[in-house]
UniProtKB/Swiss-Prot annotation:
Organism: Photorhabdus laumondii subsp. laumondii (strain DSM 15139 / CIP 105565 / TT01) (Photorhabdus luminescens subsp. laumondii)
Residues involved in NADP(+) binding: 48, 54
Catalytic activity: 5-O-(1-carboxyvinyl)-3-phosphoshikimate = chorismate + phosphate
Pathway: Metabolic intermediate biosynthesis; chorismate biosynthesis; chorismate from D-erythrose 4-phosphate and phosphoenolpyruvate: step 7/7
Gene Ontology MF terms in the entry: chorismate synthase activity; FMN binding
Entry note: cofactor: Reduced FMN (FMNH(2)).
Cofactor(s) listed: FMNH2
Protein name listed in UniProt: Chorismate synthase
One cellular component (GO) term of this entry: cytosol
PROSITE patterns: CHORISMATE_SYNTHASE_1 (PS00787), CHORISMATE_SYNTHASE_2 (PS00788), CHORISMATE_SYNTHASE_3 (PS00789)
Pfam families tied to this protein: Chorismate_synt
Length: 361
């Protein structure tokens, strides 16, 4: 199966299935001399980990990461870093009843059409369980970006259903189970999740990811534009159906006089572009938003077909998230960090000697 890798200079390749023995990834391109421990990676893995609150799937995976290679005495050696997480709480029997039935809204039907075979246990390779390795690799990138360049990558839940959360307080994000930055909406989010669990249904969400202190100049012309690569990375996250950079689709309602980010001697006057102009970072905060669909793994009966093409009605049993947007927050951070680290290394390789007389804010 192709398509298991992302990045050029900083390259991440993942492997493993939801109910397989383990998940793993190979991280190439990490410069030598970076202090990295398993504990550094575990912080973000614990934020994504299932079974940590009543609002997410009750599959209880410790997601303990092991560093297999590329780190010696707590420091990267410049060689490939191998990471592994063992699966310990698989309940494959939950899926035996659907091995010959295609769950509506899932990848069952398309995987079967493409490969002629599929791992029906929790979706196999198409499961969001795969993203644990992205988060582990992204933690390496986040640490490098922050320690080396002062770049901070953060994300939060800014919408669940029709509940809109204002980006008011980054510190609050880590203090509630929704990763919400808006304290005034916590009770509404709790009530909605209780309602969904009682109904056996799910809801969509919006996650906002912001990278601050990104230097100007990252990104390549035309096909490797920074915003194109960010959109590609974020769109590859399970359940993501839309990506916006900056004001995104909101620019449709703006005039050119409103949308352009004017420049003064003190810097930009606005950031409608989301920190990227012409596919290259402008030094403003990079802002992206992702829309995540409501999971199709719900207790509400739905129509589908079996292998024989016969119409059947099914209920998806198992342990699932009423809102996948909650655990998508650390995943979005990881994918943004992976892209930024890749482009920083590419910029250093090609343009390290470039000196500009333009001001940098």
């Amino acid at each position: 199966m192709a398509g298991n890798s992302i990045g050029q200079f900083f390259r991440v390749t993942t492997f493993g299935e939801s109910h397989g023995l383990a998940l793993g990834c190979i991280v190439d391109g990490v410069p030598p001399g970076i202090a990295i421990t398993e504990a550094d990676l575990q912080v973000d893995l614990d934020r994504r980990r299932p079974g940590t609150s009543r609002y997410t799937t009750q599959r209880r995976e410790p997601d303990q990461v092991r560093i297999l290679s590329g780190v010696f005495e707590g420091v990267t050696t410049g060689t490939s870093i191998g990471l592994l997480i063992e699966n310990t709480d698989q309940r494959s029997q939950d899926y035996s009843a659907i091995k010959d039935v295609f769950r509506p809204g899932h990848a069952d039907y398309t995987y079967e059409q493409k490969y002629g075979i599929r791992d029906y246990r929790g979706g196999g390779r198409s499961s969001a369980r795969e993203t644990a390795m992205r988060v582990a690799a992204g933690a390496i990138a986040k640490k490098y970006l922050l320690d080396k360049y002062g770049i901070r990558v953060r994300a939060c839940l800014t919408q669940m259903g029709n509940i809109h959360c204002q980006l008011k307080d980054w510190e609050l994000v880590e203090q509630n189970p929704f990763f919400s930055p808006d304290e005034t909406k916590l009770e509404q989010l709790d009530a909605l999740m209780r309602e969904l669990k009682k109904a056996g249904d799910s809801i969509g969400a919006k996650v906002t990811v912001v990278a601050e202190n990104v230097p100007a100049g990252l990104g390549e012309p035309v096909f490797d534009r920074l915003d194109a690569d960010i959109a590609h990375a974020l769109m590859s996250i399970n359940a993501v159906k839309g990506v916006e950079i900056g004001d995104g689709f909101g620019v449709i309602n703006l005039r050119g006089s409103e949308n352009r980010d004017e420049i003064t001697a003190r810097g930009f006057t606005s950031n409608h572009a989301g920190g990227i102009l012409g596919g290259i970072s402008s030094s403003q905060p990079i802002v992206a938003h992702i829309a995540l669909k409501p999971t199709s793994s719900i207790m509400v009966p739905g129509k589908t077909i079996n292998r024989q093409g016969e119409e059947v009605e099914m209920v998806t049993r198992g342990r699932h998230d009423p809102c996948v947007g909650i655990r998508a927050v650390p995943i979005a951070e990881a994918m943004m960090a992976i892209v930024l680290m890749d482009h920083l290394l590419r910029q250093r390789a090609q343009c390290a000697d470039v000196e500009s007389s333009l001001p940098r804010w």
